Amino acid sequence: MRRWIAAVMALLLVFLCVGVSAESTGETATPAAQATAAPVTAADIAKLNRPVSDLPTHVTVGNATQVNGNFFTDMWGNNTSDMDVRTLLHGYNLVAWSSQVEFVADPMVVKTVSTKTVKGNMTYTIALQTDLTYCDGQTPITAKDYVFSLLLCASPEMAALGADSSRYENIVGYDAYHAGKSKTLSGVRLMDDETFSIAVKADHEPFFYDLANIWCIPYPISVLAPGCTVVDTKNGVQLANENANQPVVPFTVDGLKKTVFDTTTGYMYHPVLTSGPYMLTGYDATTGQVDFKLNPYYKGNYEGVKPVIDTLTLLPAHADTMVQDLADGKFDLLNKCVDASVILKGLELRGKGFTADNYARLGYGFCAFACEKGPQQFTAVRQAIAYCMDTATFVKDYLQDFGLPVYGYYGMGQWMTLAAMGSLRPETVSAADSAKWDKLTLDKLNHYDLDTEQAKKLLIKDGWTLNADGKKFVEGVDTVRYKKVGKNLMRLSIRFAQTEGNAAAELIVKQLQGTLPALGFELNVDVVPFTQLLTDYYRQNGERSFDMCFLATNFLSVFDPYTAFSADGSLPGNANVSGLNDKKLVQLALKMHKTAPMDFLTYEQNWLAFQERFNELLPTLPLYSNVYFDFHTDWLQNYAPNTYSGWPAAILYAYYAEPSTEATPAAEPTSTDGTDSGTGDGEIIIE
């Protein structure tokens, strides 16, 4: 099985017009004397070789996922296009993602980071650069801005508005502060305008991703909490009244409703004072159009790269017209194309003034279950539904040869997946460890191949043997199965939310309509806008109305499913969107979390154990992972998205100019700045 998957991966990356270079396959096409030359990086080209345009330059980007308007933080959800907007608007994270396994301090932001153990807790002391400002060029960014960011995001006031602050639960003092039992966040200290510290709970150490512990983006207190300031006390940091003579702190839920969620001025939809490479100049919630212009005061990303394209526009793109719209000039760039029909049309434009880029996906497509309620709360029902899906046929119909079925919580671009396939190993590995690596495969994962008889057996064993009258279910007579749950009968009814105009969701529904009713399921399908689906998925209106839906996600910088599954699955918000509460799964995720940094073998072993438990429980129904394609005009040069960073990171290195006859080949950015930190479920995508 492992060899077959690896072979298919190779076909995807070599034979399907993906254009893998000699460098990326490990082969060399240069004489030995030239092989030692340092490769030209995207940063080299961006800083040295980009031409300066005499006229303003503009790029219009099309993405199949329309923005939802969450431009402040991912604490209320992670629509992929919202995440792209945030990456453009919010910068100066303390840490940058230098590879798929490591964060480093961003040298443009941080002078030094030192660590020491205090009372068993690892304490990180951060000294900042002194020339950071927001996009107005007048408001300085100091240690207070980072401390305010932590106080704000971990606050009970934000939680009352539905924010998921689980990212911050590793900070000492979080529990008391978040619960409203303490006004201070004891694990954070403010030394001066340039220096502050963050203490991490001992029971969260070690942490495989190490410096991800200090992930933090600055936010302006003058905008989000006017009248407030940050002070340090002997017990930690806290918010205080800007007027020292006034004891009442003007930081309330009602105040945040105004500063965050006001539809015309709120920081969620219209963040004006920001720190990233671009500034927001316009947002139309109806059309989904978002406009940006350069932030002239931006210092650069972790490699010192600043963007040169003057303005950007992000628009929703529709699968049936997007390639023609690219050819007609409506778009300059199409991002994250998945549908095989779109990809094949896009590939036809190559050599006609357009270029194709591709990269393996870190995430996967899946059917989401609301595991906190209804028939789908039972593992046997989820497994039965899995046996009613012909995943291989679905993947072939939807992706053709541009994707693969998956059977767990993983994507084909993750190093852990590649290692389990046998196609990736650490650079130096002993013979003994090599044998251990060879034993780590995905072969134990159940594929849940189409088998309606097995599905029926699972239902019967789980007690779905009654009819509406509480008597024995008789096939051919009764249509819907029931189960006695407590004193009541539960109907085997699934309400599926199908995103309007979504080809993948249509294929899934068609399959389920052909299998589920014959087994005694009732399947109700609601065709809804993507924004409505997301509102329900994130429980923004309380209890979820839908039992299933089709979605896709990309795992972001930190693959840490502990935070994704450790929260109470019945609570509203972004935490544990599967709704499943399983102690064993959480403990397996925690073992991954607490793997020592750079201990790849142990992490892989823990990762595989987690995947096997996930595959058994099916918090979601995994379907596929795939190769992404971006298509763009060849006027957009030095643009090279990759598995680890999307178009907002790649656009910093790009420029817009008439292509020369001997254009400099694009080189991939080596990483992203980690503006959005994924901790399990990442960005949510419409495909």
Pin down the residues of each PLM region.
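N-terminal lobe/hinge region of extracytoplasmic solute-binding protein
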Residues: 41, 60-117
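Aromatic- and charge-enriched surface segment that lines or borders ligand/interaction sites
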Residues: 111-167, 191, 197, 325, ...
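Surface-exposed binding/hinge segments that line
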Residues: 162-254, 423-427
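Bilobed periplasmic-binding protein-like "clamshell/Venus-flytrap" ligand-binding domains
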Residues: 205, 209-211, 396, 464-498, ...
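Gly/Pro-rich hinge or "lid" segments in bacterial periplasmic/extracellular proteins
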Residues: 212-306, 311, 452, 457-461
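Ligand-site clamp/hinge motif
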Residues: 264-269, 297-345, 522
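Append "and occasionally in soluble cytosolic enzymes with long acidic Gly/Pro-rich linkers
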Residues: 293, 377-514
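Detector for C-terminal structural segments
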Residues: 388-433, 504-513, 539-687
